[in-house]
């Protein structure tokens, strides 16, 4: 699961959704302060994930989707982007097969155990793949398919890289 839903096209296949609320509008169940950023929230196995930036650090939040209770967080150094406006992470994380994938706007890339937050592996998109930070920062959400996690590194040597989803080893670039 990642940005744009199960088919990554921004379309819900749910049926019977209530579209007209009138005065019977739903009330929020919970709210969480996560800092600045543009990451969407995703849900998998009853857990909600998003990223925020505060005090020169990005933090990935894992929250109980029903209660908002914080299950785990992981913070790492990452300044707000200096371009045009304040903001933190732009990419939405992705979850597949119990692993959460996250790309920061500065190029740090992580694979976490989705339930616990344990770091399984990490990469630096600039150092490891000769990547180039885009003007707006890395903002493409990872795509997980067929045992690979695919990201755009911005490299002149092949912008797209596919890494083994379990190990982070390079599978192909193009």
Describe the role of every protein-language-model region:
Residues 1-174:
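Noncatalytic, solvent-exposed loop/strand surfaces
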